[in-house]
Design a protein with these regions (language model features):
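Active-site/acyl-donor-binding loops of N-acyltransferases
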Residues: 2, 62-68, 113, 119-139, ...
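A conserved beta-strand-loop-helix scaffold within acyl/acetyltransferase catalytic domains
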Residues: 2-53, 58-67, 110-243
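Short, high-confidence coil segments that cap the C-terminus of an alpha-helix
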Residues: 44-46, 101-103, 206, 261-263
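Short, hydrophobic beta-strand segments that form beta-sheet elements in well-ordered domains
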Residues: 49-50, 104-110, 266-268
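Conserved acyl-donor/pantetheine-binding loop and adjacent beta-alpha core of acyl/acetyltransferases
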Residues: 64-79
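The substrate-binding groove and active-site-proximal loops of carbohydrate-active enzymes
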Residues: 78-86
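Non-catalytic accessory segments adjacent to catalytic cores
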Residues: 89-125
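Aromatic (often tryptophan-rich) hydrophobic motifs at membrane interfaces
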Residues: 93-94, 198-199, 205-303
Length: 307
């Protein structure tokens, strides 16, 4: 059993990134978002809590506003939290109790390996949807909802086709136009994401997909990242013209067809939004629960400003 005093708070410059990344790679609950290169790209600042000799780690992604330090969830990083082998309830709670006191506000999402039943601190639960692709395509597609099957057929009957040559810039632009005002992504997050994409693309861990019409206009597009036998549906760029003809349905179906019968999980990255959950579930995806942590120790007058 560990104790909180075995968990060290390290500033960014003190982190041994080779040991850090080895921990993320070998953790049963490891996720791509936890790697140092991912955090370096997407977090405004990040420090860390480290157990022993990097037996378990937790990134502390932080920023500062009105003179107060706070922990926040970076863009395009759905789940962080504690990563490591042999995690117990006590270890996870020790990490949560080891935040430096300077962080007056905590609003972060942990990962599915951090669930603690009966804990008040970890009582806020969120939904992700995942689809195991370790079956033949014919078997997976049989589980599609009938409405999804009709939408997929409609898109291809209208002459749409799959493209894997769509540029990251076009996907980012579509994402900006359709989603930036909804999900709170900041303008500076996009060049950081592009840098991350290029890094992963060069190591064979990023792919782009699109559904285009007969004139090669992009109707639906997405970027997928790969790690830990997962394919992350990381960024979506859809055109309004594709919504009524099933372009997004056709895109996911094309990805599943290409990656079926592999030891791979398609990670949809959410969602608590009913319509998105319905969309993901329609492909046979199942719910994966993960906890979120909210702690507010801000002075009352700052809480008013935050509202």
């Amino acid at each position: 059993m560990t104790t909180g005093n075995q968990i060290k708070y390290l500033q960014h410059k003190e982190i041994d990134k080779a040991k850090w990344d080895a921990c993320i790679t070998n953790a049963p609950n490891g996720l791509i978002y936890g790697y140092s290169f991912y955090l370096d790209c997407m977090a405004r600042h990040w420090d860390a809590l480290v157990l022993g000799d990097y037996e378990a780690v937790m990134p502390l992604t932080w920023n500062k506003k009105y003179g107060f330090y706070y922990l926040y969830q970076p863009a395009f990083a759905a789940s962080l939290g504690v990563f490591g082998k042999n995690l117990t309830k006590e270890i996870i709670e020790d990490f949560a109790n080891s935040f430096p006191s300077k962080f007056k506000l905590v609003e972060i999402s942990l990962n599915s390996g951090n669930i603690i039943n009966g804990s008040k601190s970890f009582s806020l639960l969120r939904s992700n949807y995942i689809l195991h692709l370790n079956r033949p395509y014919e078997e997976i597609s049989k589980t599609y909802r009938d409405n999804h099957k009709r939408n997929i057929k409609k898109a291809f009957d209208l002459g749409c086709k799959v493209s894997k040559e769509v540029s990251v810039d076009e996907i980012i632009q579509l994402n900006k136009e359709q989603l930036q005002h909804i999900d709170g992504t900041k303008p500076e997050d996009y060049p950081n994401f592009k840098k991350l994409y290029e890094f992963l693309k060069n190591s064979g861990k990023a792919k782009t997909y699109a559904i285009v019409d007969p004139k090669n206009k992009v109707l639906a597009s997405a970027i997928f990242f790969f790690s830990h036998n997962r394919a992350y549906y990381i960024m979506v760029g859809n055109h309004p013209d594709g919504k009524t003809i099933g372009a997004s349905h056709a895109l996911i179906d094309a990805f599943i067809k290409d990656h079926a019968d592999q030891n791979l999980i398609l990670d949809f990255e959410g969602s608590d939004i009913r319509n998105l959950a319905f969309f993901y579930n329609g492909f046979g995806a199942t719910e994966e629960i993960y906890p979120a942590l909210k702690i507010n120790k801000l002075p009352w007058y700052i809480r008013l400003l935050k509202k």
